[in-house]
Curated annotation (Swiss-Prot):
One function term, GO molecular function aspect: protein transmembrane transporter activity
Compartment list: Cell inner membrane
Transport found in the keyword field: yes
PANTHER family: SEC-INDEPENDENT PROTEIN TRANSLOCASE PROTEIN TATA (PTHR42982:SF1)
Domain of life from the UniProt record: Bacteria
Gene that this polypeptide is encoded by: tatA
Biological process, per Gene Ontology: protein transport by the Tat complex
InterPro entries in UniProt: TatA/B/E, TatA/E
Protein name: Sec-independent protein translocase protein TatA
Cell inner membrane is among the record's keywords: yes
Topological category with respect to the lipid bilayer: Single-pass membrane protein
Predominant localisation class: membrane
Length: 70
């Protein structure tokens, strides 16, 4: 009773096609696909690139001076 059968989904699909038409739905689908593709490319560009010289750590030699309160 709470779930939809295949007939419910077919009726919803027919109503959506009648309201929007196939051309409008095709445009919406291509726009959505372009947005997903752009998002994936943007996520790839944000990944930090580690070069060969940055893989190792850098050592800094220095003397430690204690600050004494007088």
């Amino acid at each position: 009773m709470g779930s939809f059968s295949i007939w419910h989904w077919l009726i919803v699909l027919v109503v959506v096609l009648l309201i929007f038409g196939t051309k409008k739905l095709r445009n919406i689908g291509s726009d959505l696909g372009g947005a997903v593709k752009g998002f994936k490319e943007g996520m790839k560009d944000d990944a930090p690139k580690i070069s060969e010289s940055d893989k190792g750590g850098h050592t800094i030699d220095a003397e430690v001076k204690d600050k004494q309160n007088s």
